[in-house]
Amino acid sequence: MSGIDPKRFGKVAVLFGGESAEREVSLTSGRLVLQGLRDAGVDAHPFDPAERPLSALKDEGFVRAFNALHGGYGENGQIQGALDFYGIRYTGSGVLGSALGLDKFRTKLVWQQTGVPTPPFETVMRGDDLAARATDIVAKLGLPLFVKPASEGSSVAVLKVKTADALPAALEEAATHDKIVIVEKSIEGGGEYTACIAGDLDLPLIKIVPAGEFYDYHAKYVADDTQYLIPCGLPAQQEAELKRIARRAFDVLGCTDWGRADFMLDAAGNAYFLEVNTAPGMTDHSLPPKAARAVGISYSELVVKVLSLTLND
């Protein structure tokens, strides 16, 4: 697809594993990315920061990194800052975009100030009176609701709450994962979609139809009964406009090069953006490979395209 000489990349580290709650997903993503790059002739090597110090990257002559870490320090700006310090080019967003992209609370604040539509929400802090906050939130937002830790990915500890009685326990569970919990009004009627972003590639939207209540961790990485609709079924003009808004949602956070923007449609077709992902999963269940495959781009071609974005000034 790209016609890039793989020798231009030099010695490439595929970063995967790490120590976040998403370690197992990252291990799967990283192994596939590693194989995809090697299939294209790239001099790629595995590197798990949970097992080796990052300083080894410089010591061992790596000049480039494909970041397949998910969550935690791999996605919150820390790895990005360290790679900047060592002068190693890397895939995905820089420090600011990565940090904001993993923080759903501050993402939503930026979107509110820049005109990107996002569901109404409330925040709960660890240590708050959960019963009192639950009563207040239901009065403001109604039901159903989604409860989310502010800084976990892969839908870790995300719960859908349909009754007021269930909300305090959901808040307590989410607060074990993060000191800030987001409670978001559930957008109903139009379905869930994702826009995959990879440089200048024009990738189709994907409509996600999980067998269960919503697109949770199990539906993302375990179940085989989630439906991924490509084409997504929307009129071409609407799809193009939604992709434009998705790119804006990505850009205003300082995110660059590649990732995902997830959103819901209500019954009237209005979009509400949920989150971005600056280091998307690359497993066989993951969305970017599916979107690429739908337009004739193989897994290996996709990872080379993503890596090629590190060649840009």
UniProtKB/Swiss-Prot annotation:
Reaction(s) catalysed (UniProt annotation): 2 D-alanine + ATP = D-alanyl-D-alanine + ADP + phosphate + H(+)
Any one of the GO CC terms: cytosol
Gene Ontology MF annotations: ATP binding; D-alanine-D-alanine ligase activity; metal ion binding
Residue sites binding Mg(2+) 1 per the record: D262, E275
Pathway per the UniProt entry: Cell wall biogenesis; peptidoglycan biosynthesis
Gene3D superfamilies: 3.40.50.20, ATP-grasp fold, A domain, ATP-grasp fold, B domain
Record-listed Mg(2+) 2 binding positions: E275, N277
Cofactor(s) for this UniProt protein: Mg(2+); Mn(2+)
Location within or outside the cell: Cytoplasm
EC numbers on record: 6.3.2.4
UniProt domain ATP-grasp: residue ranges: 108-308
Keyword presence, Metal-binding: yes
Cofactor: how and how many bound: Binds 2 magnesium or manganese ions per subunit.
Pfam families linked: Dala_Dala_lig_C, Dala_Dala_lig_N
Record keywords: ATP-binding, Cell shape, Cell wall biogenesis/degradation, Cytoplasm, Ligase, Magnesium, Manganese, Metal-binding, Nucleotide-binding, Peptidoglycan synthesis
Similarity remark: Belongs to the D-alanine--D-alanine ligase family.
Full protein name: D-alanine--D-alanine ligase
Lineage: Bacteria, Pseudomonadati, Pseudomonadota, Betaproteobacteria, Burkholderiales
